[in-house]
């Protein structure tokens, strides 16, 4: 587990995406990623504008947005990212052969490679998925892009553990610049081989322990102390009866204090 500061890691990181993210985390004093699963552009933009000051990263499932358009959804989203200084992570979870994911990432309705700083992929189809996604990014935009591999999940009964997780780590090693880290529940090592992977952890809650659909929550202190760099929080920020401003600052503060404790 890394006890170096975000700023120290940013200065040495081989990925411009990871370096930018680590720097803005240091500047804003936040390691909070907001996961906003809402159905309309209006809901999304309103929540993003409210939570923007507290987050380093916005996680989208863009295919949930019923009225999606590049001009109506993506352009104002990017303006808000600039206004509040956060980055965008489209949680697409690619899981096909290289040529197919290349097209899925760059083409179709969503054109993800054009606007998402970061996306993610399963390791189930092998290292070709990394190659395909990287090619799509290079052919689509001059802006740097980063990929997270899904090493572990927070849902009950997940098959992503043991040999599967280790195999995914080996796939990540095939591209030091493009693969910036993992969706995982703990540190994934690699430092002795020269890797500095960012660990982003979903299933983080200060109040709830889970839901009826198999989600399992862990506390902020627990995930950061076991190696998480970025806490991913969804309904805890904006569910019914919650004030996103209050919860945004609450989770930002909890995440930052846990990080400072880890660095001591």
UniProtKB/Swiss-Prot annotation:
Gene Ontology molecular functions: orotidine-5'-phosphate decarboxylase activity
Annotated substrate binding sites: 37, 59-61, 91-100, 217, 235
Pathway: Pyrimidine metabolism; UMP biosynthesis via de novo pathway; UMP from orotate: step 2/2
A Pfam family assignment: OMPdecase
A biological process term (GO) from this entry: 'de novo' UMP biosynthetic process
Positions of disulphide bridges: none
Record's catalysed reaction(s): orotidine 5'-phosphate + H(+) = UMP + CO2
Catalytic residues identified in the record: 93
A GO CC term assigned to this protein in UniProt: cytosol
Keywords assigned: Decarboxylase, Lyase, Pyrimidine biosynthesis
EC number: 4.1.1.23
Family designation: Belongs to the OMP decarboxylase family.
Name of this chain's protein: Orotidine 5'-phosphate decarboxylase
Lineage: Eukaryota, Fungi, Dikarya, Ascomycota, Saccharomycotina
Gene: URA3
